[in-house]
């Protein structure tokens, strides 16, 4: 009986497959500054460089400028935490809590640090 249960358990795990990233959903880089600036340029170059290693994935750059970067940051804070919406910000993000009174997100807990560019 134990052998039959073990074989059934193994058979059930064979149907499970690892999810591939990013799948069919595009990856969006949100740049909280106007198009044509240095942060926008870095995001566009990064998106182009990441296309091939990610198997030709669709990478978009979304400029959400305004309020010193807090509009774009808020957009990312409210996005689904699925790894498909990334924020490309600069040092202003670190000073925002002390300079902006009522930001609609928490800089230290609403974001997950991915890396430095």
Indicate residue ranges for each PLM-predicted region.
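Hydrophobic h-region of N-terminal signal peptides that target proteins for export
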Residues: 10-18
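Sec-dependent signal peptide recognition
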Residues: 2-7
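N-terminal (or domain-start) structured segment
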Residues: 18-116
